[in-house]
């Protein structure tokens, strides 16, 4: 009990500077932004267990799903950070996907002094002893990467991607988003920062020694405070000089002959260039080191399979959990009606569909991403307590529920029997979210009139009309009793004919009109009351089901 009280006590942010807390309540995110890139923002965070500051890297899921290149870089970075453990490679703690805020979060160690480029520009008067120490640490990290089987090529070594803790001169290699595992003798793709790219990179035929060339350019930047080839105005000019063997103008500014000699060793043609291990033996260099940490068991980011759908989906998976195993949606059988919940999040209409199938629980959430696409999250808890999440964009023009469902079943390695089930979930959600949505599969039997606001009025009007007809018939019987003559069709017909021949008085016509109005009012009142009773019944039913479900879901979260 004491432990649970402590945990609940830290769920609320401790101060206004805290914007977010991770699912394990271990890490907190502050307002302070310490770095920002094209797709990633880095905030200062804090590890409340170890009492240390951390870097909280955050990427918006919708941004990733619309840029396959950024998504691939993220997967590459997470995969490599998790697999690499070395004193000169940035330390990885944890990663997870936040379904609610639609972000990918990666916790790494914090470098209080920022990148080596920032640090060097801030501290211009630094003894060469310190520069040599930094160089040795970078090479030690590269040696580790290049010694993997198969070797890992960073492909974007530069001072912007090397980080430092200035209080004790600790340097580590980071930003592994462009790194690649060299499964063949030579890599082929052209990628990196032009100012730091080796000539062979432009020829699309290179190996790990391309990182050594980039390291040489880092050394040049550290001693001259200039980006290599800053005299060039664009990438084309840089390429022309590099391919022609022309060195950057800043190399002529290096006054120390030992430094010049060392940099030139790194910039030699690939066939003559020394490896990181060989350069570490150079008397020019020095040494330093540090320790590591172990990650928490948070839901894991999972690599999708190859294919067009894999390029626009993001998946995570959590380990089996005994509490997940006991989760119940309070649904009695496989063929039950799905629970549909409508909410409004900051002006955006959100729909959630929940349904059970043979011990597995499916929750599909969706909201309009823009006028052409819908952002969807499918969460599956299986009978063993394993939780899987898949985020994806549904394009209204080109996608169908069946096609997307088939792709998802393949990605999640589910049985083909789930294709129709998930397709029904998707179309039920879209019917409730998008006006006049044309379904791909039959879902009329699954849509309840009162389950969501978007379709509530249309379905409710239909139900009310039927109820109204029933009430009208009942009222006609109750308030317009038949005479004995009316019971006999022949007599009734004769009576009607006779009445038609008689000129009715104005008073009688007015009396009939008033009676008709009164009856219509009664019918309208009962129709409205019936609608209200139906609405209250559905609200009470949904509230009860949701209360039981949310209680179980909180245990999973």
Curated annotation (Swiss-Prot):
The active site is at residue 175. GO terms for molecular function: ATP binding; protein kinase activity; protein serine kinase activity; protein serine/threonine kinase activity. Gene3D superfamilies: Phosphatidylinositol 3-kinase Catalytic Subunit, Chain A, domain 1 (3.10.20.90), Phosphorylase Kinase, domain 1 (3.30.200.20), Transferase(Phosphotransferase) domain 1 (1.10.510.10). Residues 28-285 form the Protein kinase domain. It catalyses: L-seryl-[protein] + ATP = O-phospho-L-seryl-[protein] + ADP + H(+); L-threonyl-[protein] + ATP = O-phospho-L-threonyl-[protein] + ADP + H(+). The keyword Kinase applies. The modification Phosphoserine is found at residue 505. This is Probable serine/threonine-protein kinase WNK7.
């Amino acid at each position: 009990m004491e432990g649970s009280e402590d945990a609940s006590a830290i769920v609320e942010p401790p101060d206004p500077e805290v914007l977010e807390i991770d699912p394990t309540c271990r890490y907190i995110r502050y307002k302070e932004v310490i770095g920002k890139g094209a797709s990633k923002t880095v905030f200062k965070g804090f590890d409340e267990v170890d009492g240390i500051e951390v870097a909280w890297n955050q990427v918006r899921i919708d941004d990733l799903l619309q840029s396959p290149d950024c998504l691939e870089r993220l997967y590459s970075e997470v995969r490599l950070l998790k697999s690499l453990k070395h004193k000169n490679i940035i330390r990885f703690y944890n990663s997870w996907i936040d379904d609610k805020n639609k972000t990918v979060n990666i916790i790494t160690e914090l470098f209080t002094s920022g990148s080596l480029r920032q640090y060097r520009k801030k501290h211009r008067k630094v003894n060469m002893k310190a520069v040599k120490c930094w160089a040795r640490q970078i090479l030690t990290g590269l040696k580790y990467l290049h010694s993997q089987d198969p070797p890992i090529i960073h492909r974007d070594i530069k001072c912007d991607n090397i980080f430092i803790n200035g209080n004790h001169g600790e340097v580590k290699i980071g930003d592994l988003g462009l790194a690649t595992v060299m499964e063949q003798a030579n890599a082929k793709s052209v990628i990196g920062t032009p100012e730091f790219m080796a000539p062979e990179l432009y020829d699309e035929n290179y190996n790990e020694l391309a990182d050594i060339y980039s390291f040489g350019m880092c050394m040049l930047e550290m001693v001259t405070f200039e980006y290599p080839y800053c005299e060039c105005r664009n990438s084309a000019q840089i390429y022309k000089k590099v391919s022609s063997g022309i060195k950057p103008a800043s190399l002529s500014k290096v006054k120390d002959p030992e430094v010049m000699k060392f940099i030139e060793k790194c910039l030699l043609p690939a066939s003559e260039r020394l490896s990181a291990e060989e350069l570490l033996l150079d008397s020019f260099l020095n040494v330093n080191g540090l320790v590591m940490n172990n990650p928490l068991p948070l839901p894991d980011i999972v690599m999708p399979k190859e294919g067009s759908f894999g390029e626009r989906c993001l998946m995570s998976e959590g380990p089996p959990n005994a509490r997940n195993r006991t989760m119940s949606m309070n649904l009695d059988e496989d063929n039950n009606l799905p629970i549909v919940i409508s909410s409004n999040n900051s002006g955006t209409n959100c729909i959630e569909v929940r349904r059970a199938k043979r011990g597995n629980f499916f929750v599909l959430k969706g909201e309009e991403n823009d006028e052409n696409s819908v952002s969807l999250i499918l969460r599956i808890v299986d009978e063993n307590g394993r939780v899987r999440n898949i985020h994806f964009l549904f394009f209204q023009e080109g996608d169908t529920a069946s096609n997307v469902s088939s792709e998802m079943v393949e990605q999640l390695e589910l049985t083909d029997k789930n294709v129709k089930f998930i397709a029904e979930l998707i179309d039920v959600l879209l019917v409730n979210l998008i006006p006049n949505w044309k379904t791909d599969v039959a879902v009329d039997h699954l849509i309840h009139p009162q389950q969501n606001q978007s379709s509530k009025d249309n379905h409710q009007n239909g139900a009310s009309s039927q109820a109204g007809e029933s009430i009208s018939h009942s009222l006609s019987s109750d308030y317009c009793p038949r005479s004995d003559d009316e019971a006999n069709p022949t007599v009734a017909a004769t009576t009607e004919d006779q009445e038609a021949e008689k000129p009715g008085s104005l008073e009688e016509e007015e009396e009939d009109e008033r009676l008709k109005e009164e009856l219509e009012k009664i019918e309208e009142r009962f129709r409205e009351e019936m609608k209200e009773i139906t609405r209250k019944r559905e609200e009470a039913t949904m509230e009860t089901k949701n209360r039981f479900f949310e209680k179980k879901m909180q245990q999973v979260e």
